[in-house]
Amino acid sequence: MASSEEVDRISRSMLVWANTFPDKPVTVIKYEFLDIDDAAGDDAAMALSTIQGTYITQRYIIGGDQAEYQFKIIYRIKPGTSNDKRLQADEMLNHFGDWARTQHPNLGNGINALRVEPTTQSSKFAAYKDGYEDYQILMRLAYEVNV
């Protein structure tokens, strides 16, 4: 397992990177927290959330290692009876996954992003009594440290 300091650094870098997605339907993608400010007129929110920590997948004889950071992007909307809004949520998250394949994050000195890729297609994973629904896409970042 990667050190907590390394994971914190990766999480911060990934959040900055996710917020460069040009087609995000919100002003800011947040970390591990979805809030909708009805008073401000917000009707959607997005968050990056880590999944089960970061794993070292390979150690190199000459030093350094390769690791995998698993995360998901969550999109919360209130679609009402609109199937079109639901489909648009999936489409936007799948588009994020496509964008992520070609846009490597800057992870700082000594850490090199190898690839970012979705591990699933977007899907709905929660519905709430107040009418909001959460959609998610699961992803992973492969990176090298001190190589």
Placement of each model-derived feature along the sequence:
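Beta-rich nucleic-acid/ligand-interaction surfaces
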Residues: 35-43
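A short, hydrophobic beta-strand-centered structural micro-motif
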Residues: 43-50
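Charged, amphipathic alpha-helical segments and their flanking helix caps
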Residues: 1-36, 52-147
